[in-house]
């Protein structure tokens, strides 16, 4: 009998959810940086074997929203609780288990299997790990607790095996050749946004949205026009930099990553525009694809 199901990955910001997703899928589906709130959307990555299809879903980190964009991000995370066949709740050894208790209480009430993954165990010793496990067991008594290190791939194979055991008997939900639910344009915008997260500080990376206006592929090359939206003129100046140096660096590094991602030559043009206070506008958020429904 064939098995299939939705395995949703949730947890607080910066606990390694996207790194874990990429390790489980075996492809770089989600961008991952050292900064919190890197993931903004819910992204599916699909693992297929002859007997099984696992539809993983990476989600934004759980947070208390300060503006409408963060409200949408939280809604993506909460939607992952309602359609999971198996839930992966990711934490790290240094995290306060009581953080975002409201969300945790919702996880505790779930009737599907919950696997609590304590990530980055290479940063702890045996005694402290035992204390962490005990604390989490008191908060999520029905969850199975598995220590892992997503970055070092420790425990990932064991986790995949356990997920396979928990999945329901079901035909595949997606074509067996399909790797994700997102189109190519989505990954272009995410790769460009990843470079912005890496190369800019403070509020700039969080005030940015990237859209792809043109994506034309021929036999030898992909032609891409992208727009970086910021909220204020001053941010536009910072993104472009003195004599355009900063934007050129983003463009060059994005092109390299895109060529690696698509496996062919890329011609990339990036423009910068101001869309005032887009993070607080429902209309703009909808146009940028931040509607969780």
Residue positions per predicted region:
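P-loop NTP-binding site
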Residues: 184-293
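Conserved G1/Walker A P-loop phosphate-binding module
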Residues: 1-75, 79-81
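Conserved glycine(s) of the Walker
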Residues: 16, 155, 246
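Conserved, well-folded catalytic cores of nucleic-acid-processing
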Residues: 27, 46-50, 84-87, 94, ...
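Canonical P-loop GTPase G-domain recognition
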Residues: 113, 122-180, 184
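Active-site glycine-centered loops adjacent to acidic/histidine catalytic or metal-binding residues
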Residues: 58, 119, 149
